């Protein structure tokens, strides 16, 4: 393993076995960062490490694997102990792991066509407070409470658990960085619920507890089958709520830890499992955005939401 020095940087990437996470691991390691690639599926994680070593001539000096379930505190604790023992600190935490909260039903091609139409609206700068004219769930995907809960637990609470667990090790770094992978689908204009929008928009009074309150209220409304009457978005609902909450949480963190550089980012509409590989960008192109924020200088921005490499509105 690489010698522990003040110049060597150590990174943890969640969901690193495929897609944007995989390419982020590759790019960071190529820049001299020692990377811990994590995934819930141990077999897939080990296979990913072997592919990276073969494709990029990496060794254990550059990259290693550790199994991680971000919904399991014991699993997170095991990773914290590994990082503490091997490196003594952490410099970069990239919360990349995420799921869509829906399940494909029927013809995947139908879902792809729906996503392409919908995303063309989502990825515009038209802040009109509407859901692009989308009023009902389209064909091609279904959701239920289990999928919705898992989406929130993974995309929001998973990132939150990881952050809280690694703050002590990040505080030992001279250049601590946290990158939360969000989405333009988490923009407030698509959240629709006016109360939630007002809570998350008020950056001056925003707290972690208020973000949690929005998430819990959404889950309560979903359980009571009142999301439509309460004005929550009708499509990819849990995904939007989870990503909006993550962007808001990033703001709270940046205020709480002013010596850190903490940002959220939409890597663009990339070909990934989450969108049935309908994206227009490659995973590698998406990963560039994450790496850019992970390697910010100490006087770089913090608490912002980026679309790829540019600051965008929330």
Swiss-Prot record:
It catalyses: (+)-neomenthol + NADP(+) = (1R,4S)-menthone + NADPH + H(+). The active site is at 239 (proton acceptor). NADP(+) binds at residues 13-36. The keyword Oxidoreductase applies. Induction: Strongly induced by inoculation with an avirulent strain of pathogen, but not with a virulent strain. Induced by salicylic acid, ethylene, abscisic acid and drought. Not induced by cold, wounding or H(2)O(2). GO terms for molecular function: (+)-neomenthol dehydrogenase activity. SUPFAM superfamilies: NAD(P)-binding Rossmann-fold domains. Optimum pH is 9.0 for the forward reaction and 7.5 for the reverse reaction. Pfam families: adh_short, adh_short_C2. Keywords: NADP, Oxidoreductase, Plant defense. Expressed in flowers and red fruit tissues. Not detected in leaves, stems, roots or green fruits. Its EC number is 1.1.1.208. GO terms for biological process: defense response. CDD domains: carb_red_PTCR-like_SDR_c. Substrate binds at residue 183. Monomer. Involved in basal resistance against pathogens. Belongs to the short-chain dehydrogenases/reductases (SDR) family. This is (+)-neomenthol dehydrogenase. The gene is MNR1.
